[in-house]
Structure formats: structure tokens, C-alpha cells
């Protein structure tokens, strides 16, 4: 294997050789991030004895650093973000982000200018209720693109970054099962251990059910495990491959 593409992490880490773009390059897409803010995101990424947030080895710190790498690439593709930041406005343009924990948190556009500040201003902690964030993301997309002809609407590419199965999984699983070529999901799972592995299995099963519904057997839910990965650059590069 090419050493530059070698992966680190635990036994369930998705091989990097299997990671590919979720949406083909010739299709227009609108990426959106659903970010897990639950308490366990403060825990260590690779071991239960690892130091917690604000240590650089915590899941939260690693994810924030990885998102820096992702948004830098995405804003090169986003003329609005580039224009807004050139004019000194870092509030607009970037990766539209919705947080989920005990409740929905509207985070807004994340870009390289505001990411650190925005993610440190919000309240982290609690359980893992994802549906309110998904509904908000869908409403945002419909507001921006709903009046366009269906052929002119970009693919809604939803990146879910999480470390655990949703507390409202029974509601979210059918959303994944019904994913389409116009509504694609990438699920990136960080953390380690039994909780990570159970989460991975649940999302993989939803992805298989989704593929079974497609008459051509195509998969519209990509599930990637970052089992015990502690290198944010490695995660960023894989997210860039999946989303950009």
C-alpha cells in the first residue's frame, strides 16, 4: 500500500483504499455537516484512559482540527465563502453546520476564519438526539433550493460526524434507509471500543438496507470508521475524499 495512504487506528478502521467520493465529481452537491456535541465527544479518542477535552487527544479536539482541514478545501470550491472572507465577513460562507446533543444547536456556516470561535462558543454535552438537526438541515436546503427545477437542485450531501448511536435512532434509521442519489449521507464514526463498534454496525446495517431499496443496488449511505484514529490530518484527508 502507498505509505501516504496507510491508515492508523484500531481493527475496525475503514481501510483508506476503500474510501472514495460519496458523490461523483460531475454532479453538483451541497455539503452540510451534522456534528455530534454529546458528552462522550469530550472523551479520549483511542483509549478509555486517554485524557479528556481540552487535551489534543480528545475526540472533540481531533474532530475540530480535522474539520479545519476539510473547510479549507471546501471554501476553495465556494466562491461565496471566499468573497465574504475577503471582505472581512467571516460569518457567512462555508460549511453549513448543525449540532446535535440533548437539543439542536444552530452553528451556521463554518469556515477557516470562524471555525475555532464558533465551535468553542456553543454548549457541548448531553445525549445524542440527531433528528432535530437533520430536520433543520433539510429545511435549510429546501428554503435555498426548493423552488428550483429538480434537475437543477444540487445533491444534498450530509456529513454526520458522531461517536455513538443516536438516542432517537428509531427515527433516524428510516431517513438513512430512504437516502437517494439526490440525498446522500456520509457517516464518520470516531472513538473506540464497544460503543464505537455497536454504532458502526447499526449504521452499516442501515446502509445495506438502503442499497437493497435501490433498483440498481447503489449505495447512498457511506459509513466510515475512524476507530481509535488520533491524527486529525488523517481524518481530514479522508473526509475531503468523501465530501469534496
Spell out what each predicted region is:
Residues 22-24, 73-89, 139-153, 176-180:
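Surface-exposed acidic, glycine-flexible loop patches that form ligand/cofactor-binding
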Residues 103-107, 113-155, 166-168, 189-198:
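Von Willebrand factor
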Residues 28-29, 40-92:
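…and closely analogous acidic/polar surface helices at protein-protein or active-site interfaces
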Residues 205-244:
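C-terminal helix of von Willebrand factor
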Residues 127, 164-211:
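VWA/integrin I-like adhesion module and closely mimicked acidic/polar interface patches used
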Residues 35-38, 63, 70, 97-100, ...:
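DG-centered beta-turn motif at the end of beta-strands
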Residues 1-52:
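Acidic, polar low-complexity linker/tail segments
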Residues 79-122, 197-205:
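Short beta-strand-loop
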